[in-house]
Amino acid sequence: MVDVKTCLDNAQEKMDMAVMYLEEALAHIRAGKASTRLLDGIRVDSYGSMVPISNVAALSTPDARSITIKPWDKSMFRAIEKAIIDSDLGIMPENNGEVIRIGIPPLTEERRRQLAKQCKAEGETAKVSVRNARRDGIDALKKAVKDGLAEDEQKNAEAKLQKIHDKYIKQIEDMLADKDKEIMTV
């Protein structure tokens, strides 16, 4: 027989994962300020394997408009530059032989709108995942009723599941509002 607590815990775990995915996705959407997290998703070919830039170089932000990358191995300059150019970030690296500098240009109004739209799409994906977790939980509870769980226990558990769902949806909406504000602030 399925335990009510297990159903709720499983659903909450799936909802947690959806929120964590959204946090990660929003961190990669630049808001006009330099951040080394902007480069987290970029992989570099290092001796035949694809690794994050942070595994082959030191990353820093000397000011609000630039990122510096200092490769530990001088032979990695080309691979790092190529990976950055091939990414969809729309930034160009400058190599001076010692470090790679990336100037973060101020966002245009049109680009800000595109990024806000991208954030909303990521948020909608997270909301769908949270709703799917709720649906899976409800299905598990209905199956538990067939296995002998009392119907009033099922209804109480569904109400708890709905409250958990609402909390996560609100958290997602708050995250999106914060990111939207960050993007749209000039």
Curated annotation (Swiss-Prot):
This is Ribosome-recycling factor. Gene3D superfamilies: 3.30.1360.40, Ribosome-recycling factor. One of its GO terms (biological process) is translation. PANTHER family: MITOCHONDRIAL RIBOSOME RECYCLING FACTOR PSEUDO 1, RIBOSOME RECYCLING FACTOR. It is found in: Cytoplasm. It holds the Pfam family RRF. Responsible for the release of ribosomes from messenger RNA at the termination of protein biosynthesis. May increase the efficiency of translation by recycling ribosomes from one round of translation to another. The keyword Protein biosynthesis applies. GO terms for molecular function: ribosomal large subunit binding. GO terms for cellular component: cytoplasm. The gene is frr. Belongs to the RRF family. It comes from Bacteroides thetaiotaomicron (strain ATCC 29148 / DSM 2079 / JCM 5827 / CCUG 10774 / NCTC 10582 / VPI-5482 / E50). Keywords: Cytoplasm, Protein biosynthesis. It comes from the Bacteria.
